[in-house]
């Protein structure tokens, strides 16, 4: 019985440790080209809605030019309250990122 509980605990810990948070995800893209983020967010993918149902969708991008020549790229999830914001310089390199919304955490 103890071995079963230990094995189950190890399995759960191993699986949950693979999930990165939204902040870590954003940090990992700083220094990348905005085209990499666009490819990730604008490519349709399937997400589970319930045990029996899933939806295929892509995030919606809004670009806002900033006064200093940089561009803010906001990627909105159409089904959840989550927006990922990237600021890219004139060369398309991501220099900053943030998120907003109640459902951005994994």
Task: Walk through the language-model features, giving the residues of each.
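Residues within mature, well-folded domains
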Residues: 16-106
